[in-house]
Amino acid sequence: MYGMLTKILVKSGKRSELLDYLRWDAEVARATEPGTWRFDVWEAGPEPGVVYLYEAYKDRAAFDDHAKHEPYKKWDEIADKTMEQVTDVIPLTDSLASNLDE
């Protein structure tokens, strides 16, 4: 399994636009990317203006497939418009145990 956890500081007044984009990205992943196992958008109550993105893929090849789709190609454009800062990008490269293990 391959994945990442990303912390996004959202620009003031841009939360709805960012969430619309991330929901679209999740819909595309669900409809067209069988190797995308998780594409979750979270918020932590005590951190207003912060969104967490958790992604889990079958393997690196599945992430590479995700990167070929339209939402991924628009990431930089959306980031410029809606994100103050992207921090704590934590690559998760080797799953040690998972409920998805076969």
Provide a role label for each language-model segment.
Residues Y2-L9, R38-A67:
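Short, well-ordered beta-strand segments in beta-rich or mixed alpha/beta enzyme
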Residues Y2-T32, T36-W37:
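N-terminal first-folded block
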Residues G13, W24, P46-P48, E70:
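Short alpha-helical
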Residues G13-R15, P46, A62, L96-A97:
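Generic "edge-of-domain/loop-turn" microfeature
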Residues W24-T36, A56-I90:
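An amphipathic, aromatic/His-enriched active-site/gating alpha helix that lines ligand/cofactor pockets
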Residues D40-G49, D76-E102:
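Glycine-rich beta-strand-turn "strand-cap" elements at beta-sheet edges
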